[in-house]
Amino acid sequence: MFNLNEGVLASIFTEAKHWAQMPWYAVVPAIIAICVVAYLLGSVNSAIIISKVFYGEDVRTKGSGNAGTTNMLRNYGGLAAVGTLVGDMLKTAISIAIAGVVFGFGYAGPISVSEMCYVAGLFSIIGHVFPAYYGFKGGKGVLSTATMVLILSPIVFLILIVLFIGIVWFSRYVSLGSVVAASLFPVVLHGYFAVFSVQMPGLMALSSILLAILIVWCHRSNLVRIGNRTENKLSFGKKKKPESDEE
């Protein structure tokens, strides 16, 4: 049966019967392993791979210099952008699924499945932003974060995407929409649990806060430009080359 503390994905993984109660210290190696695997998966950057393999270039030397979907679209076209989009979403989903399998089937310890799914998602996004394979220079983590929230908390995702669209529509700043949505992620997630009078698991709360801080930090230059009124605005009527990307 669905448990709010476990979430949608976790409710699928916990259908199997738990076979043991494990103390927290016995779970530490599994937690560390999942964090490392998620980080290494997140470090695989589809934009860099596609641009190098198929175009003989590093996308980070083109356009805005961001290794993300928008910059791929601008420089290499729709097919390259779709490949990047799918790759970035898959690595986040796979990281979460691994945590769900390890902590869902045959496990009944002090950490919930959803908590570990959030932790895995966090480390995958850290890998995307600071990829070990590419000199720790990656994307901004917006798409990866959106993928994680969509998988683990679809209702929270819907609320945040409405806020994002509203802010972008009225301000024309995509970066501002990303920052505000990310900043409100921990608040909306906490509110979601509060509506059902359920306490949010600690690691889930911590992961959401760290993600919000990370996304805001990644957009620090955008915020400076917004303050100086030099940040490019999104144009719905005519094509205008933006100065930065959001992936």
Description of each model-found segment:
Residues V37-S43, I48, G83, I125-G135, ...:
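Transmembrane alpha-helix interface/packing and boundary motifs in multi-pass membrane proteins
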Residues L158-L160, V174-A182, Q199-S208:
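Loop-to-transmembrane alpha-helix initiation sites
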Residues E57-T69, Y133-A146, Y173-A182:
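Short, non-helical or kinked segments that cap or interrupt transmembrane helices
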Residues I48-L79, G138, V224-E247:
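Cytosolic, membrane-interface loops and tails of multi-pass inner-membrane proteins
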Residues L73-G78, A99-F103, F123, G141-S171, ...:
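Interfacial segments of multi-pass membrane proteins
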Residues M1-V27:
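Short, strongly hydrophobic alpha-helical membrane anchors
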